[in-house]
Swiss-Prot record:
Database matches in Gene3D superfamilies: Vaccinia Virus protein VP39 (3.40.50.150)
Protein name: tRNA (guanine-N(7)-)-methyltransferase
Amino-acid positions noted as binding substrate in the UniProt annotation, renumbered to this chain: 121, 153, 190-193
Alphabetic keyword roster: Methyltransferase, S-adenosyl-L-methionine, Transferase, tRNA processing
Organism: Clostridium kluyveri (strain ATCC 8527 / DSM 555 / NBRC 12016 / NCIMB 10680 / K1)
Family: Belongs to the class I-like SAM-binding methyltransferase superfamily. TrmB family.
Keyword Transferase carried by entry: yes
Function: Catalyzes the formation of N(7)-methylguanine at position 46 (m7G46) in tRNA.
GO cellular component, one term: tRNA methyltransferase complex
Cross-referenced PROSITE patterns: SAM_MT_TRMB
Domain of life: Bacteria
Amino acid sequence: MRLRKKWWARPEMEASNLTIINPSLFKGKWKDEFKNDGEIYLELGCGRGKFLCTQALNNKHINYIGIDLKDEVLIYALKKVVEAEAENIRIIPMNISKIENVFDRDEVGRIYINFCNPWPKRRQKKRRLTHTGFLNIYKKFLKPKSEVWFKTDDRGLFEESQEYFVESGFSIDYITYDLHDSGFTDNVVTEYEEKFTNLGMKTMFLIARIV
């Protein structure tokens, strides 16, 4: 579905000190931005921010950064962060393909990828956020033995992503084809997940760790 342009979104985001407009300036300096030594976790494709805010409020000792491309979506994530008074969140409006310019070696402790675009056509697969090209970039700034938590409702993407992780030097430490019937207790539900689980969608989930 095409999002209607919200011309007011970018000025409102730029006016907030929770939005990082030039993130490359913070490479290697994110702990200075948060003013603490807590771990930094990323959500790639954070959407409207429910997952991000819930995680941050439940884990105030951890710093969270949500990244997404569309201002029309991110403005709602920002509003949630402000309403929640979650000081341990920053929002970055950015194409994730540029992420290598934003984080330095060993600067990030975990990545969450929730229901990303499956890019099913062969010529599009390199755009997948779990593709080996992206995974090898993430490894440049993830700490040793860090984890990537990945959720999707697309079986093809899920099964091919397992191959991507192994090829890129990750072990798969946990996997389920039906997260909500798995007994896994640390799941935080996204807006998309909540809506479509109620319609019968099964969520596939894995935790991959750098070997």
